[in-house]
Design a protein with these regions (language model features):
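Hydrophobic core of transmembrane alpha-helices in multi-pass small-molecule transporters
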Residues: 118-135
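Multi-pass alpha-helical transporter architecture, strongest
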Residues: 140, 186, 190-218, 223
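Helix-to-loop junctions at the C-terminal end of transmembrane segments
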Residues: 79-90
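Cytoplasmic membrane-interface "Motif A"-like loop-to-helix N-cap segments
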Residues: 88-99
């Protein structure tokens, strides 16, 4: 089409990264914040928690490994559930409900695992399932950018955000543990609140639904219905 042709010609005259940063700032910011949520869920809950359980509550390494394996398996199911929910109900509802569940389950996990060690596998499995809300992150990112800059937009937003937050999260949580041993719980709670806010923002912006087909006129989740 004429619109596609003109867009492609304009894109060819400038760097794709420049086009993404200049023309799609909102999409970049939202994608980077969602990647931060993803990194918090994976790095803190899945990767750091086994060692935290050993130091904070004195669990044996073999026990935390088993619990972590259960959480990882449940994470896979959670990601599938989040994807299905995003297709069925939209990204906004998925992040609103998923973030609330993540906040509640992570708070319970970090605070009850020590006093109820017999419930460790259940608590870790449930929070692992709820971390699966991050499975809806790619759903939003794919629809955040128009086709002509989609690959560049996703790769730029994801890689820059994960390099920053994925790298700084372990350091930040470790430093915060000097203030409170429950730093992982507070960190995940804070990011869950951010996910909740983004969910409402997506709802206000028009949401992301599968029936909104790819267009060349702009990022589809910023198009009001």
């Amino acid at each position: 089409s004429d619109v596609c042709s003109s867009d492609c010609k304009a894109l060819a005259q400038e760097l794709p990264v420049k086009a993404v940063v200049v023309r799609h700032k909102k999409a970049v910011v939202v994608s980077m914040l969602l990647t931060w949520l993803l990194s918090a869920g994976i790095v803190v809950v899945i990767l750091m928690s086994p060692v935290w359980l050993q130091k904070q509550y004195g669990f044996a390494p073999a026990v935390t490994l088993q619990a972590n394996s259960i959480a990882t398996i449940m994470l896979c199911f959670g990601c599938l559930a989040a994807g299905l929910a995003a297709d069925r109900f939209g990204a906004s509802v998925t992040f609103i409900v998923g973030s609330l569940l993540l906040a509640a389950s992570s708070w319970a996990f970090y605070h009850l695992a020590g006093s109820h060690p017999e419930q460790l596998f259940l608590l870790y499995g449930v929070v692992g399932l709820c971390v699966g809300v991050v499975g809806a992150v790619p759903y939003v990112m794919v629809r955040a950018f128009p086709p002509e800059v989609r690959f560049t937009g996703i790769s730029f937003s994801y890689n820059v955000s994960y390099a920053i937050f994925g790298g700084l999260t372990p350091i930040a949580v470790t430093v915060l543990m000097g203030v409170s041993p429950m730093a992982p719980a507070w960190y995940v709670l804070a990011l869950s609140v951010m996910g909740l806010v983004l969910g409402f923002w997506l709802r206000q912006a028009g949401g992301c639904r599968a029936r909104e087909a790819d267009t060349t006129e702009g990022s589809v989740f910023f198009t009001n219905r």
